[in-house]
């Protein structure tokens, strides 16, 4: 946050919008999840073997040795040990609940046993929880449906610690949401200097496990600078390079000796082959020679990606950042290919985008440092680069958006409808480590989007339907 304008006190986030079946990064599409399996549906050629016919269909298994075609295993003990009578493996012992489903723990050589009389119904497979779907995601297993978001209780992780993911973004990989954000545990005195970027994981948007500090001051020597600021990290997946790519705002705490100013006004890029692994520093720079501060990412279903940020003059001087710029990224997502100015002289920051049908919506806040203000949105019937209408529509969220600032819009794509969740930061300017969060469902009346406060509200993650609001 804390974008600085000449018009505002120098006291002081971005959106990845994905939503596809696979990585669904809330920024619009794209990612293909890690891991892999072929066509799933149950066993994917599990240890039930490829030739043994005794297994009938091995329905229960998701790769268990009663799997696809009998429990004899891939070679099943010559070619017939999984044979017609299912002699390939003592009651499907080739892997009771084959994990992952790609080859089944029954093994490739019919480890289910030599002349076991089992087979027949693939009893070893029991109720295996995960084969692999065609997109590489596990299938089956327990699914949480109705969940309640509590805006009044503590936002803690599974260890009881306060969630440190400020200015964050979200990406969904298979059945898991990942929440990236600024770790401000050590920012107890109101300064926003960089310490780490956190990654949390959840299957229900309520129970969050801290997976990793994916970027730290030890990631690269260039990050070990007490004046460094990194804000609003967002992550999308590049299906071509098979890398998760993170963009964020890069800056320095002081300019020409003036504490509290942004002087670099740049973007920074990191990559990782796994969503929650250690990310590698790539570069920091001014996109197309333009200054860049608060930012987010957007990804189209065809994989085209955009970096959106508060733009201003190039160079290393603190200046007025009144414009909003959309930077189309290169095919590897590591550099900028072209730049379009979409909201000129509107002095906005803290962007979050979502798309419904053929319309794009972009919510943002005014630039008032750490102090909250009323969030408002614009509409584009063209592309993320516009044309946008020129009149901001308030979300009706009182004059401070209940003391929050936008950071992301999370789409919950269900079997009946898609619900869009406004995710905001509630900043504590005196002790940033105590900053917290506000999540509310966006509602549409056919003409206008609205945000209404609820201390608690519930949603069915399978159908996408709000069950209470």
Regions found by a protein language model. Give the residues of each.
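Carbohydrate-active catalytic/glycan-binding domains of CAZyme proteins
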Residues: 136-469
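Sec-dependent bacterial lipoprotein signal peptides
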Residues: 1-17
């Amino acid at each position: 946050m804390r974008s600085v304008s000449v018009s505002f006190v120098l006291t002081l986030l971005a959106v990845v919008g994905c939503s596809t079946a696979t990585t669904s990064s809330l920024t619009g599409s794209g990612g293909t999840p890690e891991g892999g399996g072929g066509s799933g549906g149950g066993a994917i050629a599990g240890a039930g073997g490829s030739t043994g016919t005794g297994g009938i269909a091995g329905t229960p298994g998701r790769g268990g040795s009663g799997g696809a075609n009998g429990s004899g295993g891939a070679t099943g003990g010559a070619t017939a040990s999984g044979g017609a009578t299912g002699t390939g493996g003592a009651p499907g012992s080739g892997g009771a609940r084959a994990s992952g489903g790609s080859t089944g723990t029954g093994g490739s050589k019919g480890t289910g046993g030599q002349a076991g009389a089992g087979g027949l119904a693939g009893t070893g497979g029991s109720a295996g929880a995960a084969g692999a779907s065609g997109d590489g995601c596990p299938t089956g297993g327990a699914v949480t449906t109705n969940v309640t978001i509590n805006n009044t209780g503590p936002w803690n992780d599974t260890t009881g610690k306060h969630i440190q993911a400020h200015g964050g973004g979200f990406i969904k990989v298979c059945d898991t949401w990942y929440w990236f954000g600024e770790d401000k545990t050590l920012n107890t005195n109101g300064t926003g200097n960089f310490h780490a970027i956190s990654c949390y994981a959840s299957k229900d948007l309520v129970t969050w496990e801290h997976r990793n500090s994916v970027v730290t001051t030890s990631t690269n020597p260039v990050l070990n600078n007490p004046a460094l600021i990194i804000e609003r990290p967002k992550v999308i997946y590049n299906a071509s390079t098979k890398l998760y790519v993170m963009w964020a705002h890069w800056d320095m705490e002081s300019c020409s000796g003036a504490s509290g100013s942004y002087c670099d006004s740049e973007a920074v890029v990191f990559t990782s082959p796994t969503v929650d692994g250690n990310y590698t520093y790539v570069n920091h720079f001014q996109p197309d020679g333009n200054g860049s501060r608060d930012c987010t990412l957007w990804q189209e279903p065809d994989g085209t990606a955009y970096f959106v940020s508060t733009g201003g003059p190039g160079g290393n001087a603190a200046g007025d950042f009144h414009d909003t710029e959309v930077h189309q990224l290169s095919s590897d997502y590591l550099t900028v290919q072209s730049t379009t100015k979409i909201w000129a002289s509107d002095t906005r920051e803290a962007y979050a985008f979502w798309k419904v049908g053929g319309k794009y919506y972009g919510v943002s806040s005014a630039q008032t440092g750490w102090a909250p203000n009323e969030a408002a949105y614009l509409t584009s019937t063209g592309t993320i680069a516009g044309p946008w209408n020129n009149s901001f529509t308030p979300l009706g969220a009182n004059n401070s958006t209940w003391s929050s600032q936008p950071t992301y819009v999370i789409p919950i794509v269900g079997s009946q409808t898609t619900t869009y969740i406004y995710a905001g930061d509630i900043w504590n300017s005196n002790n940033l480590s105590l900053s917290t969060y506000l999540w509310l469902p966006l509602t549409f009346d056919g003409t206008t989007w609205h945000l209404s406060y609820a201390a608690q509200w519930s949603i069915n993650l399978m159908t996408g339907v709000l069950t209470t609001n």
